[in-house]
């Protein structure tokens, strides 16, 4: 059974995102004093009284404005209400009832989900009761006074919300979904790609650059595996971003890379690889995340039988530090090869979580040493690689024990990394090597202990 969903609905600047952060104990939702800052619906995890649930934050609803985004924001609110068990209608207790509040109340009366009126900006219980009384006029039931900033009344509100959830299936066991972050510059088609994958208009798509300013989380199931897809704000060069909501969205995009299991780096086939694409790729490599490179807008490229191979060669030369990443050419508009993203992303995640026994690691190292001996200094001192062992996953990490790490230059280290990757068949994930100095006698003791363990 899916987690219950709580939808946050209201006009601009009544404190919806602040309440989301309070309910979910996070700072994920963008909080900034500008109408319409939240334009897509964004999901966060909540927990109260032994119940897990999802909180979906929607854009500020307005019914008397002709702005390009407002019809789309209303559509996002509709989609949120369709999946919600409870809708929280947020109003401003200090302003009182407005025409916009009345329009939203009318909008909600035809919806099937349960509705609670939440009167925000009530900074004390006594003040709150007086402010809340006016909102009975909306005809949506009892108003609940709270202060999202200070937390006043939020415990009572959560008690009521949880009471409206369906009964919990105690036998249910849910595995953590694979977290897939869709990363890229503005306007490369990330949101269109997400919509093509999900089969619904999940993120607002517009020709205006930077129209996704939050990270947008979507859960889907594909061939029995649960995925959490994160569509991030387009990431620009830092000096071109002001300290407004876009700045916070970009930083959240970097956070999405950190918490992802696999990143889909989206490149515009018409633009090719830019400096900013290289910086993004470097960030993914730095964080040690599995990665898939998606070349989007392939339908718009004039091509012949050699175009794909030539473009792949060019892209790989510019993203050489992601030479281990799989690449796929797609069109989010036509759906071409979009289905293949799951197969390659699954491969990358599985590879990043793979463990290899110490004996197999050392078989590969022994073969590598046969083909190319460690370097020797001008003074005649040669490096010695004793053995290696895997010490971590996500990404796969190996410690190599040697006589003196400084004897192994960058060229030889890259050679060993390449031999480990090819010999062990790692694809779609970076690997990390740690070079550790060790005395010969300590190595002999280690080998003796390992041999004894095998015999036992």
Curated annotation (Swiss-Prot):
Q: Name one GO molecular function term.
A: ATP hydrolysis activity
Going by the UniProt record, its keywords in alphabetical order are: GTP-binding, Nucleotide-binding, Repeat, Ribosome biogenesis
An example Gene Ontology biological process: ribosome biogenesis
The entry marks the following residues as binding GTP 1, namely 10-17, 57-61, 120-123
* Residue ranges of domain KH-like in the record: 354-439
**Where do the annotations place GTP 2 binding?**
184-191, 231-235, 296-299
Q: PROSITE patterns, alphabetically?
A: G_ENGA
The EngA-type G domain extends over 4-169, 178-353
Q: Which InterPro entries match?
A: AAA+_ATPase, G_ENGA, GTP-bd, GTPase_Der, KH_dom-like, KH_dom-like_a/b, P-loop_NTPase, Small_GTP-bd
Whom does it interact with, and what assembly results?
A: Associates with the 50S ribosomal subunit.
What does the UniProt record say this protein does?
GTPase that plays an essential role in the late steps of ribosome biogenesis.
Family to which the UniProt record says this protein belongs: Belongs to the TRAFAC class TrmE-Era-EngA-EngB-Septin-like GTPase superfamily. EngA (Der) GTPase family.
Which NCBIfam families does this entry report, sorted A to Z?
A: GTPase_EngA, small_GTP
- UniProt-recorded name of the protein: GTPase Der
């Amino acid at each position: 059974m899916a987690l219950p969903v709580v939808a946050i609905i209201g006009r601009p600047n009544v404190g919806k995102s602040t309440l989301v952060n309070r309910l979910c104990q996070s700072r994920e939702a963008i909080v900034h004093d500008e109408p319409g800052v939240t334009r897509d619906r964004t999901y966060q995890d909540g927990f109260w009284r032994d119940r897990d649930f999802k909180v979906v934050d929607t854009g500020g609803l307005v019914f008397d404005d002709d702005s390009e985004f407002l019809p789309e924001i209303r559509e996002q609110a509709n989609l949120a209400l369709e999946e919600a068990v409870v809708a929280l209608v947020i109003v401003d207790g200090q302003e009182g009832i407005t025409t916009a509040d009345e329009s939203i109340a009318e909008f909600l009366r035809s919806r099937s989900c349960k509705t609670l009126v939440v009167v925000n900006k009530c900074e004390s219980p006594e003040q709150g009761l007086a402010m809340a009384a006016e909102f009975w006029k909306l005809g949506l039931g009892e108003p609940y006074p709270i202060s999202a900033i200070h937390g006043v009344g939020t415990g009572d509100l959560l008690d009521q919300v949880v009471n409206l959830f369906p009964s919990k299936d105690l036998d249910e066991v849910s595995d953590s979904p694979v977290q897939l972050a869709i990363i890229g510059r503005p306007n490369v088609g990330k949101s269109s790609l997400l919509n093509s994958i999900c089969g619904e208009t999940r993120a607002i798509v517009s020709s205006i650059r930077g129209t996704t300013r939050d990270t947008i989380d979507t859960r889907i199931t594909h061939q029995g595996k649960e995925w959490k897809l994160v569509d991030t704000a387009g990431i620009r060069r830092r000096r071109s971003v002001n300290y407004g909501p876009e700045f916070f969205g970009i930083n959240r995009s970097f956070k999405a890379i950190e918490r992802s299991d696999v990143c889909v780096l989206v490149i515009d086939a018409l633009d090719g690889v830019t400096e900013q694409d290289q910086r993004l790729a470097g960030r993914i490599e730095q964080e040690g995340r599995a990665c898939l490179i998606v070349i989007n807008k392939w339908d718009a490229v004039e091509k012949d039988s050699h175009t794909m191979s030539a473009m792949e060669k060019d892209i790989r030369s510019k993203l050489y530090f992601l030479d281990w990443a799989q690449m796929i050419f797609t069109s989010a508009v036509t759906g071409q090869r979009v289905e293949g993203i799951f197969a390659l992303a699954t491969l990358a995640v599985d590879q990043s979580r793979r463990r290899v026994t110490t004996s197999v690691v050392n078989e590969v190292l022994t073969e590598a040493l046969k083909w190319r001996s460690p370097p020797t200094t001008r003074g005649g001192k040669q490096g010695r690689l004793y053995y290696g062992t895997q010490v971590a996953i996500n990404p796969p990490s190996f410690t190599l024990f040697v006589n003196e790490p400084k004897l192994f230059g960058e060229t030889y280290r890259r050679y060993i990394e390449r031999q480990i990757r090819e010999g062990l068949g790692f694809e779609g994930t970076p690997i990390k090597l740690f070079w550790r100095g060790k005395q010969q006698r300590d190595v002999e003791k280690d080998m003796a202990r390992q041999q004894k363990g095998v015999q036992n």
